[in-house]
Amino acid sequence: MSLNSLTYPLRYEDLSLDTDPEIRLDIDRIDEPANSEPGFEGIIGRSSALRSVLQMVETVAWGDSTVLLLGETGTGKELIARAIHSHSPRRDRPFVKLNCAAIPTGLLESEFFGHERGAFTGAIAQKIGRVEVAEQGSLFLDEIGDIPLELQPKLLRVLQEREFERLGSTRTKKIDVRVVAATHRDLEGMILKGEFRSDLYYRLNVFPISIPPLRERPEDIPLLVEHFVQEAARKLNKTIDAIPSDSMAALTDYQWPGNIRELENVIERAVILSRGSVLRVPRRDLQSRVTAGHSGAKLETLADVEREHIRAVLKQTRWVLSGPGGAAARLGMNRSTLYFRMKKLGIVRPCF
């Protein structure tokens, strides 16, 4: 049975290997022509929502305009940034990534602009910053909403004047680099709170592209499942060639607050746990996810859905956040992102 001839839902109890209840997965295909748009290998999906994004990528790629990618965590913003670079005249030049949320504030300026020997305590050698490494290429600034206020004027200078100085140097260096930034945060709301400069926002927001969450492109989920099964099976040296139809239906119906990253994590765990050639998504895990998306009481906002889902996973893991079996891994996030989401959603660890 192919992915184009799905019949579901079926009762899980009725499934057996000799009744053809599974969707056959074409895991031997290498180039995945049916899963990706031509020229966008690695970006999986054929939905109209994704095609709209890729059309915008093709439109903006050939210029040098700054691009701002907007979307929830785990939606694939880095893949879109790389697609912009690979479709641009700078494709043969460096693509340099800097995650503004992953580097301590005290080190971020040095990562951006570099430093001279002796610029500060511990600077025992000259360091070339990411801006300089990206010369004639593209600089991808992930989580731009987390850049400290004191560093924002210097980034604005790079965008406006195309120049900077290394820390500890008075020599101004000219730079030729295209900036693509990304964030899951509400930058306009941050401006109103005094947390983000409006002039920097306007420089970044020349060509915004909104990346749709996975729940808005459910028709892409079977293709993503096939892709992630293929990747995980190869990595783990296993053979998985089918998935129960009701499992695929449940995966497709679920809202995926962690988006593609969460789906990838769920599939890898399922491949690890599957003993035969049929993908077995843990029934308890799958049922908790489906319940979160199909509860009797309709939740008012997406934040409510996300809050309840994170709480459910935290209870399953006994509030253990780290490690391969922790809540962060189950949700497809890193621990710092989970801490941030818990704080934002008002989730407090109970006293045991």
Regions found by a protein language model. Give the residues of each.
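Conserved helical "switch/dimer-interface" subregion of ABC/ABC-like ATPase nucleotide-binding domains
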Residues: 56, 87, 115, 154, ...
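Amphipathic HAMP/coiled-coil signal-transducing linker helices
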Residues: 26-41, 294
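Bacterial C-terminal helix-turn-helix
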Residues: 2-9, 13, 297-352
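Conserved post-Walker A coupling segment in P-loop NTPases
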Residues: 42, 49-121, 132-148, 213-218, ...
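Conserved RecA-like P-loop NTPase ATPase core
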Residues: 53, 75, 98, 112, ...
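Base-recognition residues in the alpha-helical recognition helix of bacterial helix-turn-helix
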Residues: 153, 157, 165, 334-340
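Nucleotide-binding/hydrolysis machinery
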Residues: 2-22, 40, 46-48, 88-93, ...
